[in-house]
């Protein structure tokens, strides 16, 4: 097994034990749910060595798996070789595949955590529902392992904001439309 990946997974497992969790989901995501993330948020890549833009790492005290779609199966097999991380080929959706995998590796009523900033409320509800069907619990966690175990974590890069020139509407038109919707909904 790759020693750096093994030691990183061990550190995550200590975090889980210290926080009363039985498993952890590491998505490739940032707080904006971007498709491509800044290196500061590439925790899954740091833990597993897998560099594809899609996929989630699933970790328990005794096992780890990467769930990803068919675009990345060959790449994942190559990059995970010797890591001890199993490849789970996505067939039915991330929540369902994750629940199935955790159900096979955990006991009923065990708790799986995920960084609360890296999942949409819609996805969190879906994960919680499919996990409940497998008698597992999902915990949205604010104090996350990447803050404590990721040594030499890259700083966030500051990139300038730019206008999206392909859109038929300019920035002011988009903001006006947004303000109208907010006003209609009674939001501030």
Model-derived regions: residue spans:
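Terminal domain-start leader segments
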Residues: 1-188
């Amino acid at each position: 097994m790759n020693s750096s990946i093994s030691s990183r997974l061990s550190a995550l497992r200590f975090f889980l034990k210290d926080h009363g969790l039985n498993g952890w989901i590491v998505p490739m995501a940032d707080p904006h749910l971007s498709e491509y993330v800044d290196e500061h948020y590439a925790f899954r890549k740091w833990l597993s060595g897998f560099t594809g833009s899609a996929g989630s790492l699933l970790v328990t005290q005794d096992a780890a798996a990467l769930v990803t779609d068919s675009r990345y199966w060959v790449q994942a097999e190559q990059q995970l070789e010797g890591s001890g991380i199993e490849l789970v080929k996505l067939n039915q959706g991330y929540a369902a595949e994750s629940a199935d995998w955790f159900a096979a590796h955990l006991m009923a009523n065990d708790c799986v955590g995920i960084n609360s900033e890296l999942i949409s409320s819609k996805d969190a509800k879906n994960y919680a529902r499919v996990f409940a069907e497998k008698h597992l619990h999902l915990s949205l966690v604010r104090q996350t392992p990447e803050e404590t175990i990721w040594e030499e974590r890259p700083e966030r890069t500051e990139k300038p904001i730019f206008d999206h020139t392909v859109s038929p509407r300019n920035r002011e038109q988009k903001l006006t439309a947004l303000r109208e919707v907010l006003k209609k909904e009674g939001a501030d």
